[in-house]
């Protein structure tokens, strides 16, 4: 028989025997701890720190308008700086073509068309055959000479600004190359390295460092170690004391955050800013070597330094990149831009332009500086020359008030068009967009030699309609001076009126 038939059915397997627990180095392993129930499984929440609080940045048109308004002026000043470096301040267009990269021109543009867009600043003259040169107009040259004279006359103020900048640094020493980034913003003379830095050894001296020459402070003046915020606080206290003496039974004043007009913050953001303001003020001229990086006290000191630097500038604004060059001297954090954005009650960061700009909020009112010095007034005159149109508009026919109103509407319309935002073409830089707008999108290869240099294919048409305008004016004058015409027959007899 088959062996399979002799097996019992159903087959019940024998019970498996378990092996004894193995020991690890002679001792049993402890059982893993059981996790706590779900309600008790809470992650530790870090303590709230004011310095790390995030504040959402919000666009503000008045400050962005300042950047947009200086868009053309920035290009013109670049052209002027290249021109004044030439002998007799005259330059050929062929030589100007070598500075395309400095002007921010990544594509070929018509330089002749670009220069003729600013007739109030540049004069394009012909010298010889196919030789074009350009120079400053008499009005633009006068403004340039006035600016040089004013910068040289204000040398004492420039020395005080350099001393205050050195007094705020940690080692009381700053590389001259870094100071040069703030040269125009502080109103320093063009050649301050060879003039201001060497003429006042009683205040600072030039020392040789591994990374280049540096400016080192030699005399500490306690009278200069007073920040603009402290002076403003003293004036505010004096004003409140006068009001307290004049007003009787005045209600108690509560500590509250006075936000600028138009600035909208959430309740949490306003609470964090209020807590930061209640912290004791740390002077930017005080010793900050003991302050720990990332702490609230260090950020309070950093905000004071940025506030003081912006107070020293001519227009109370500068580029954020210029401030980042001083990370080592002032121990700024790596996220300096984020730190400035976290305090919208003091600063405003504009993303308009190729590089971000930071404004001192208290120094502006509706996109205008509250206090303007002579350099700012000269810049406004230069902006007026830049705005001079190439082809003046024809005078409007009508009364003086109507013509004035029409010109005013045209001017306001041009101002609005210049100030409107153009965020669509993000691929090109702002300077490239401006050149494209001014030159009509044409390159140097688009024009021909000869008449194309002067005509540019956009000359104004001849005034064929002048006679019609004169006739219309005569008819209008005749009807206005005399009485209403009397209807008559062809033979002269008067007709009956209806």
From Swiss-Prot:
One of its GO terms (molecular function) is mRNA binding. Residues 417-427, 456-466 have a biased composition (Acidic residues). Disruption phenotype: Seedling lethality. InterPro entries: PORR_domain (IPR021099), PORR_fam (IPR045040). Residues 397-427, 446-498 are annotated as: Disordered. Residues 59-387 form the PORR domain. One of its GO terms (biological process) is Group II intron splicing. Its main location: plastid. Keywords: Chloroplast, mRNA processing, mRNA splicing, Plastid, RNA-binding, Transit peptide. It is found in: Plastid, Chloroplast. One of its GO terms (cellular component) is chloroplast. The keyword S-adenosyl-L-methionine does not apply. Residues 1-50 form a transit peptide. The keyword RNA-binding applies. RNA-binding protein involved in the chloroplastic group II intron splicing. Binds specific group II introns and promotes their splicing. Functions in the context of a heterodimer with the ribonuclease III domain-containing protein RNC1. This is Protein WHAT'S THIS FACTOR 1, chloroplastic. It comes from Zea mays (Maize).
